[in-house]
């Protein structure tokens, strides 16, 4: 019994520490966002409504976690707007589709809805 426990602990200890698995990659999120577009156009397939809701729920979760910490909420911003911003951003970066989806969503929302201090820094950096 002790030998089995020691062996199990040793095997766990040999697992790579740097390995991680994100819930969604950018590619997986975009697949679900595309399903949402099909639903909106009335050409949805079986499972598209579920996939669309999953994508929107994921984006809403990222928004709720990072609002004010990274980007600023504006009165009247809808989940539909946040979803559209995310869809456009992820589509424009196919070379990053392997990255964690939460990271891409956060970047998309940060660029679309920067806090006032960040807006001023962006303007100064662009020479505006």
Q: What do the PLM-derived regions correspond to, one by one?
A:
Residues 9-13, 110:
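Short N-terminal leader segment in a subset of presequences, especially plant chloroplast
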Residues 37, 64-128:
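Compact alpha-helical subdomains of small soluble proteins
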Residues 22-88:
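Short N-proximal segments of mature Sec-exported proteins
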């Amino acid at each position: 019994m002790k030998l089995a426990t020691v062996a199990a602990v040793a095997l766990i200890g040999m697992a790579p520490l740097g390995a991680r698995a994100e819930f969604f990659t950018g590619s997986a999120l975009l697949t679900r966002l595309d399903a949402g577009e099909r639903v909106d156009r009335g050409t949805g397939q079986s499972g598209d409504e579920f996939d669309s809701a999953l994508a929107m729920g994921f984006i809403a979760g990222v928004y709720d976690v990072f609002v004010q910490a990274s980007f600023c909420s504006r009165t009247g911003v809808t989940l539909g707007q946040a979803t559209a911003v995310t869809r456009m951003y992820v589509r424009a970066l196919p070379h990053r589709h392997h990255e964690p989806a939460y990271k891409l969503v956060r970047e998309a929302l940060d660029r679309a809805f920067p806090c006032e201090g960040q807006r001023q820094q962006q303007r100064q950096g662009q020479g505006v």
